[in-house]
Every structure is written in structure tokens, then in C-alpha cells.
UniProtKB/Swiss-Prot annotation:
InterPro entries the UniProt entry points to: GABAA/Glycine_rcpt, GABAAb_rcpt, Neur_chan_lig-bd, Neur_chan_lig-bd_sf, Neur_channel, Neuro-gated_channel_TM_sf, Neuro_actylchol_rec, Neurotrans-gated_channel_TM
Any one of the GO CC terms: chloride channel complex
CDD domains given in the database record: LGIC_ECD_GABAAR_LCCH3-like, LGIC_TM_anion
Protein name as catalogued: Gamma-aminobutyric acid receptor subunit beta-like
Length: 496
């Protein structure tokens, strides 16, 4: 019994001493941390005492070397109209300022672990207003702002040896001069130009850190793919001196998918729609003309929409060539029907006049010949001749009517009033014909020479016996030509 009592007393004494030791360690630790905080506050006050923010580190000596690295947060927008792009990124700058060197304890215990760490002070961004910082700016900047939610996104970190890390997060809009000759099958190079505003290379030399850029692989753009980047540095000679400039260039490849569905595919379908008129009867004038005009206006609307999203540049772009050629194809389809209509009515009018002359070849003295020529069908045929697009045939109609059919032999009672009125137009048109003949004599000789030349050219054109041949060949020529154009277009720009 006595043995068990001694063991219990010994165990209790052991745990009591262990707890007391832990409590003592906590107290010592707390005192050390409290002393350290007091020492840090005193250290910061000491390093700022007598510190001149106007002078760069190592003033009057060797140039100060300032390291740079960037972390890309996001690409926000790229504008072809304004020739710029917007990007959000983190910029970190590194330099050494011996005036900010300090030594608190050498090593200390952290609150969360017992590992010793070197002296590093992470301070708020407001501390940057109390020390010297580089006057870094972006040479191609248009507009920038520093993020301030929930606090200003700035970082200042001091090392015991005077090393300074100065970081910030901001969004900037940078100029990017784009070459749009191959738009939208183009690729662009957009740069970030970093430079010191006031310090020349004799005072500040900037350089890229070993890992200059991060986050490019994770950045995404709706219309572009980032296929690579490169960094370089060079000296920029300006009116006020020579400055060190760091440059980061992004290689951007435009994605064609949006333009295929927004521009190219609708244009192709509109051109193919214009070919439908080749299968419509050539006498359906209203249908074919309406279809042709609709396709022309639709192509005009598409072209206007594309131009509204681009700057007003003078050179021709790839999409301009495609849209212009599509417009040419739909306009040519409309002109094709004009040729069909001209040929059809001109040929029909010639047949009518020939039939009238064959019907009444002699003088109008015999009543039976006059009755034969003066039928309802003849008058309707003369109306068709008046619709001919060839002016000479329209004028010849009235000459043949007056010369071969005597109005005194016409039995006007046999025909409806509309036909009788139509037949009475002969005198008026004969007067117009005589006036026109008098006007011709006053025209310049050059006009007559042009007419003779046009007649000679017209004589060389092969005569078409059937107007359907024009539509028949158009059904093959138009699709083949458009296919050949597309092959040449896409091969040229894709291989380029």
C-alpha cells in the first residue's frame, strides 16, 4: 500500500513539474514576442529616421539595378477599332536599399512553427510612400488604374540586408498597333513596354528576373489564342537621355470560328441563294428581280456590319476581298437575268415584226388581205413588240404598222376599245419618230462613231437562238467560279 502511494505521489509531482515548465516556456515566448514587436516598431522608426526619399539608393555611385517580373491575371479585351488591349497583371520590382537594412535578433520563433526564419518585414502598401521607389511607367500605356478593393493592392517587403520587394496589382490599357491586312486570318504582336520615366541608364538599370513572366498559360481570350511570348531589353534614346526599356511581346493568333458563323457562312449562303434564279422561268420577271435585289441588299448589310467593327484604314483586308467578291457574284446573277430578259424580248419582237411583214407583204388595196392582217392576234403581237428592250425594234413597229396596214381598212368594230386605242397611237409615235430623226442630225459626229463601233461589236457577238442556254450555262459557270475563288482564297491566307 505504501509502495502504491509513493508511485502516485511521484507521478503527480512529475506532471506538476511538466505543466509548470510548459507554462514557463509560454511566458518566456510571450515576453520574447512582445519584446520583438517593440523592437520591430523601434527598428522601423530608426530606419526611417534621417531617410531622404528624394535620393535613390547608392546615390552618386554605381547605377541601381532594379529587377522586374510580371504575373498575368487576365486578358480583358482587345479592340481593333482603338488599336489597343486591356490586361490585368501583378508587377513586382526588386532592388536593394542599404539605408533600409536592419537586424532585430538574427533569428526568432514564429507564432505558428518553431523554425527559425531570417529577418523579413512585410508591411502595408502605405509604407511605399515613405521610401524611395522606382518611377516605373508603361511607355505604351493609354489608361491604367490600381485596384483598391478592399484595400489598395500594393505590397512592400523589406529584408534585413536592405532588399526591397515592391508589388502591385492593376489593370492597364496598352496601345497595340495591329496589321490587319490578313484580318480575320491574322496574328498580332502586342507588347508591354516598361521604362523608368526620369532615371537614365547612369542612375537606374532595369532587368528581367530569371522567371520574368507567369500566368500566360492560364490566360484565355475569346477571339485569340496566345501562342507564345518573348522578353527583351534595350536602350531607348530620347531627347532627355538614354533609358533602359524592358519589353514583353505576346504572340496572338485570331480564332476564325466566330467569323465563319458570323460572316463567311452567311455570305456563302447568300451567294448560293442568288443562283436559285437560274432555275426560275425567265418570264417570271418579278420573282427573279426581287430575288436578285434581295441578295444584293443582304450582302450590303453584311459588309456594313463588318466595317463597323473595324477602324477606318485605307488598305484592303482579307475579309474585304471576300465580301467584295461575294457582292460581285450576287450582282452578276442579277445582271445575268437582265441579259436573259433583253435577249428574250428582243428576239420575240423580231419574230413579231417578221410575222406582220409576212402577213401583209403587198399594198393595202385588197380588202381580204386587210382583214387577214387586222386580227386580234396581230394587234396583241404588236403590243409585245412595243415591249421590246431594243429601241430600233420599237420604232420599226410603228413604221411597219403604218406602211403595211391602212387604218381606213380596219374594221374597228371587231375589237375591244382597248385595242382600238392602242392602234391609234401610231400617229403620236410617228411624230416622236420624226422629232427624233431631226434631233439625230444635230448630234456630234463622235456619238455616231461610237454607235457604229457598238454596232460592230454587237455584230461579233454570237447570236443566241434559245435564251434558256444562258441560264443553263450560268448554272455551271457561277458555282464553279465561286468554288475556284474559295479554294484560292483559303489556300492563300491559310498557307500564308
Amino acid at each position: 500500500m505504501t509502495c502504491f502511494t509513493r508511485v502516485g505521489v511521484s507521478c503527480g509531482l512529475f506532471f506538476f513539474l511538466l505543466g509548470a515548465q510548459l507554462q514557463l516556456i509560454r511566458c518566456i515566448r510571450k515576453d520574447v514576442l512582445a519584446g520583438r514587436l517593440e523592437n520591430v516598431t523601434q527598428t522601423i522608426s530608426n530606419i526611417l529616421q534621417g531617410y531622404d526619399i528624394r535620393l535613390r539608393p547608392n546615390f552618386g555611385g554605381e547605377p541601381l539595378h532594379v529587377g522586374m517580373d510580371l504575373t498575368i491575371a487576365s486578358f480583358d479585351a482587345i479592340s481593333e477599332v482603338n488599336m489597343d488591349y486591356t490586361i490585368t497583371m501583378y508587377l513586382n520590382q526588386y532592388w536593394r536599399d542599404e539605408r533600409l537594412a536592419f537586424n532585430i535578433f538574427g533569428q526568432y520563433f514564429d507564432d505558428e512553427n518553431d523554425d527559425g526564419i531570417s529577418d523579413v518585414l512585410t508591411l502595408s502598401g502605405d509604407f511605399a510612400e515613405k521610401i524611395w521607389v522606382p518611377d516605373t511607367f508603361f511607355a505604351n500605356d493609354k489608361n491604367s488604374f490600381l485596384h483598391d478593393v478592399t484595400e489598395r493592392n500594393k505590397l512592400v517587403r523589406l529584408g534585413g540586408d536592405g532588399a526591397v520587394t515592391y508589388g502591385m496589382r492593376f489593370t492597364t490599357t496598352l496601345a497595340c498597333m495591329m496589321d490587319l491586312h490578313y484580318y480575320p486570318l491574322d496574328s498580332q504582336n502586342c507588347t508591354v513596354e516598361i521604362e523608368s520615366y526620369g532615371y537614365t541608364v547612369s542612375d537606374v538599370v532595369m532587368y528581367w528576373k530569371p522567371t520574368p513572366v507567369r500566368g500566360v498559360e492560364d490566360a484565355e481570350l475569346p477571339q485569340f489564342t496566345i501562342i507564345g511570348y518573348e522578353t527583351n531589353d534595350r536602350k531607348e534614346r530620347l531627347a532627355t537621355g538614354v533609358y533602359q526599356r524592358l519589353s514583353l511581346s505576346f504572340k496572338l493568333q485570331r480564332n476564325i470560328g466566330y467569323f465563319v458563323f458570323q460572316t463567311y457562312l452567311p455570305s456563302i449562303l447568300i451567294v448560293m441563294l442568288s443562283w436559285v434564279s437560274f432555275w426560275i422561268n425567265h418570264e417570271a420577271t418579278s420573282a427573279r428581280v426581287a430575288l436578285g435585289i434581295t441578295t444584293v441588299l443582304t450582302m450590303t448589310t453584311i459588309s456594313t456590319g463588318v466595317r463597323s467593327s473595324l477602324p477606318r484604314i485605307s488598305y484592303v483586308k482579307a475579309i474585304d476581298i471576300y465580301l467584295v467578291m461575294c457582292f460581285v457574284f450576287v450582282f452578276a446573277a442579277l445582271l445575268e437575268y437582265a441579259a436573259v430578259n433583253y435577249t428574250y424580248w428582243g428576239k420575240r419582237a423580231k419574230k413579231k415584226i417578221k410575222k406582220v411583214k409576212e402577213c401583209c407583204p403587198g399594198k393595202i388595196g385588197k380588202s381580204e388581205r386587210s382583214e387577214t392582217c387586222s386580227t386580234t392576234e396581230d394587234i396583241i403581237e404588236l403590243q409585245d413588240v412595243r415591249m421590246s428592250p431594243i429601241p430600233s425594234l420599237r420604232r420599226g413597229t410603228y413604221n411597219a404598222t403604218l406602211d403595211s396596214i391602212g387604218t381606213e381598212t380596219m374594221n374597228l368594230g371587231k375589237f375591244p376599245p382597248s385595242f382600238r386605242i392602242t392602234r391609234n397611237y401610231g400617229t403620236g409615235h410617228s411624230q416622236l419618230r420624226r422629232r427624233a430623226q431631226r434631233g439625230i442630225s444635230t448630234r456630234p459626229r463622235m456619238l455616231h462613231a461610237l454607235k457604229r463601233g457598238a454596232s460592230a461589236i454587237k455584230a461579233t457577238i454570237p447570236k443566241i437562238k434559245d435564251v434558256n442556254i444562258i441560264d443553263k450555262y450560268s448554272r455551271m459557270i457561277f458555282p464553279i467560279s465561286f468554288l475556284a475563288f474559295n479554294l484560292g482564297y483559303w489556300l492563300f491566307y491559310i498557307l500564308e
